[in-house]
């Protein structure tokens, strides 16, 4: 088994945990690939340094919060490389393991006592370029105190004309992120669906909607003189303006996660209490 490690590098506790994990893997004769950003913090392992775009591990340990997972997934999901996420963030809805449980879980990993969970992603077309999101696309105004006027269609049928502070189009994985804070439902990741959630809509009858994942969702911008920003998984920002159009569809590339037990609802409930 070859194991990769991608980590947040702005937190000393994460770097210390990385060092401990690396030593454990070496002691167990495991081949290790380390993200080149990590080896800048741990130069003693520079011989194991690999650019994230060239990682070819069987499984990648992702040490950080949901942001670290989303960053890693952009490069790993096209290669179908599963992630084992270790929570060194705040709440961590995408993470599987707490630091105090890491060695128990590594023992299970090396014994192949785990399963792989597949999660839906969405492809987003903006300015003739396709992007993939695991959590969500967020559309928001770039002008403070202004609202967006949007037309939302599903398979060419107009669903709503939305006047709101913004709009979220989420996967089930993203339903516990910004979408939940905006009043959207928590959706089991086994559900093959996309969720459309307006942010502070002007009309009271503009409500969240769940649509089949294999639908084509189109968002069109209706008012001249207004500009906005499209934010993809909190990482990529794209500007848009009048008559701009965004399309979303189910991605052919799923995300893959290492899991040790099926406990989605228990995990969500516990993390909501902590959050």
Curated annotation (Swiss-Prot):
Subcellular location, principal: cytoplasm
EC code(s) of this entry: 2.7.1.23
Enzyme class at the top of the EC tree: transferase
Catalytic activity: NAD(+) + ATP = ADP + NADP(+) + H(+)
Keyword set, alphabetical order: ATP-binding, Cytoplasm, Kinase, NAD, NADP, Nucleotide-binding, Transferase
Cofactors, names only: a divalent metal cation
Compartments reported by the entry: Cytoplasm
GO cellular component: cytoplasm
Superkingdom in the source lineage: Archaea
Gene Ontology BP annotations: NAD metabolic process; NADP biosynthetic process
Listed Pfam families: NAD_kinase, NAD_kinase_C
Catalytic residue positions: 66 (proton acceptor)
Protein residues bound to NAD(+): 66-67, 71, 135-136, 146, 163, 165, 176-181
Entry's Gene Ontology molecular function annotations: ATP binding; metal ion binding; NAD+ kinase activity
Similarity comment: Belongs to the NAD kinase family.
Functional note: Involved in the regulation of the intracellular balance of NAD and NADP, and is a key enzyme in the biosynthesis of NADP. Catalyzes specifically the phosphorylation on 2'-hydroxyl of the adenosine moiety of NAD to yield NADP.
UniProt name for this protein: NAD kinase
Gene symbol of the encoding locus: nadK
């Amino acid at each position: 088994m070859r194991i990769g490690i991608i980590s947040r590098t702005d937190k000393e506790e994460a770097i210390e945990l990385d060092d401990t994990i690396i030593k454990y893997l070496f002691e167990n004769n495991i081949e290790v690939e380390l993200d080149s950003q990590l080896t800048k913090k741990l130069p003693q392992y520079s011989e194991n340094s690999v650019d994230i775009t060239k990682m070819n591990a069987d499984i990648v340990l992702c040490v950080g919060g949901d942001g670290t997972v989303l960053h890693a997934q952009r490069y790993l999901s096209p290669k179908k490389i599963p992630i084992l996420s270790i929570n060194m963030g705040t709440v961590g809805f995408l993470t599987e393991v707490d630091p105090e449980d890491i060695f128990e879980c590594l023992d299970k990993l090396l014994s192949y006592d785990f399963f792989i969970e597949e999660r839906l992603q969405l492809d987003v077309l903006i300015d003739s370029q396709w992007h993939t999101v695991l959590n969500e696309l967020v559309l928001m105004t770039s002008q403070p105190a202004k609202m967006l006027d949007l037309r939302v269609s599903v398979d060419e049928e107009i669903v709503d004309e939305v006047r709101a502070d913004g709009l979220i189009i989420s996967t089930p994985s993203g339903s516990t992120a910004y979408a939940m804070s905006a009043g959207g439902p928590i959706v089991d990741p086994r559900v093959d669906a996309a969720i459309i959630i307006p942010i502070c809509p002007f009309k009271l009858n503009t409500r969240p909607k769940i649509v089949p994942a294999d639908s084509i969702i189109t968002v069109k911008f209706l008012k001249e003189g207004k500009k906005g920003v499209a934010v993809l998984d909190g990482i990529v920002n794209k500007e848009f303006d009048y008559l701009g159009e965004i399309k979303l569809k189910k991605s052919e590339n799923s995300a893959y996660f290492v899991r040790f037990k099926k406990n989605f609802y228990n995990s969500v409930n516990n993390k909501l209490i902590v959050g």
